[in-house]
Amino acid sequence: AKAANVQIVTGDTKVVKKGEVDKIYINTAGIGMIPDGIDIGPHRVKAGLDIILSGAIGDHSIAVMGQRFGLDLSDSLTTDCAPLNKMVQAVLDKVGTQVALLRDPTRGGLGTVLKEIADQSQVGIKVEETAIPIHEEVQSVCNILGYDPLYLANEGKVVLIVEPSVTDEVLKILHSFEEGSEAVLIGKTLDKNIGKVGLQTAIGGVRLIDLLGEDQVPRIC
């Protein structure tokens, strides 16, 4: 809360029978405000916009799974949990009117979020597989266990859909924060193939991305 400059304004406790709860359970509800002049949502997404991803995907799912199941993973592979409000605020302060949508690729991962955007906004989406950052350790685990990193949960990433005229500026802002140091342009919205997400693969083909059918790993968040 301190890192995100969030105030904890109230709390509550519950009394349960002895032995029913052996650890602390925490549940939170956040309340925020939408700044004046900011209009962000699926209704703003149209064809011809750029899609930016703030960093590498899959770290959180694989790190948590490794701890849960005792996998011997690299010490460098850790959850990506991080407060993003300061980074996002910096983008909105500078080019807020040119930002159409912000989404968090949490449960269901990047693939599910992109498909939801295509459906809700009635646009087509094309993304480049080679542009999507995936750390080597994550890709290795996915290769061994048969997971698709596009559908792994993330806890410290954001997808931004912006006007092409501000893409370079948005990337510069994101790169100035540790949480956005690996931010990249991954694709565009289209006026064709409405409701579909096409992944341009490394070998030159196109793979259609759909919603996550079922969790690849046990629920982690």
Please report, for each region that a protein language model flagged, where it lies by residue.
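Helix-biased detector of long, well-ordered alpha-helical tracts
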Residues: 1-221
